[in-house]
Amino acid sequence: MPQEWNISYGNLRFLLKPMGFKHTGLFPEQAVNWDWFSEIIGDAVRSGRSVKVLNLFAYTGGATVAAAAAGASVCHVDAAKGMVAQAKQNAALSGLAGAPIRYIVDDCQKFVEREIRRGNKYDGIIMDPPSYGRGPTGEVWKIEDSVDGLIRLSASLLSDSPLFFLINSYTTGLSPLTMKYILDRYVTDRCGGVSEAAEIALPVKSTHGLLPCGASARWYAK
């Protein structure tokens, strides 16, 4: 097996390399979400609107690259410096080295709190929080305990005419319906629009079945 290699998805290109925890640097099941919000962004941009997107727990930038390719300005936030560096590589591979992407190495919740104080707003928010983790000073992140508060805070960063909100989870203890309920509570009830949630999966060619790969809940304006 090579140490690293590139793959393509449409006009996007990504660097893959084996990492710990059986990761390769990309979650291909997220392509269904990339296509979804890229269409929303593209429609808005074609109508003459500028679109700002916040990508939290942004990892190696699959969603960042997809959103930027669709025409959005993106703020990419992840606490791991190495992941942010690989996100820059992925943007360059996709011809987006000069795209309006801000790369931030920071704790995502603390960044959101600062953005609230600064009064910044975003038209779309993407988040892919980990199931469990520890911050730089030992604070514990457990998605079942913390995701409600994070979505509540992040929802206050939505603009007056928001386009979408997406949350992904790979935690069995956080069901799609639970994520949808939280989105409805903090986003749909305030902004109107439509919410939906479902498992996401990868097709298995040998069996013609589907391999479950987590879940997504997403909201979009009508």
PLM-predicted stretches and their roles:
Residues 162-222:
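C-terminal catalytic and target-recognition region of SAM-dependent MTase-like enzymes
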Residues 1-28, 35:
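Non-catalytic substrate-recognition/targeting regions of SAM-dependent transferases
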Residues 80-126:
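S-adenosyl-L-methionine
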Residues 153, 158-165:
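Short glycine-dipeptide loop
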Residues 60-72:
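Conserved SAM-binding loop of SAM-dependent methyltransferases across substrates and taxa
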Residues 49-59:
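Conserved class I S-adenosyl-L-methionine
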Residues 81-83, 105-109, 122-153:
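Mobile active-site "lid"/loop adjacent to the S-adenosyl-L-methionine
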Residues 73-79:
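Conserved SAM-binding motif I beta-strand of class I
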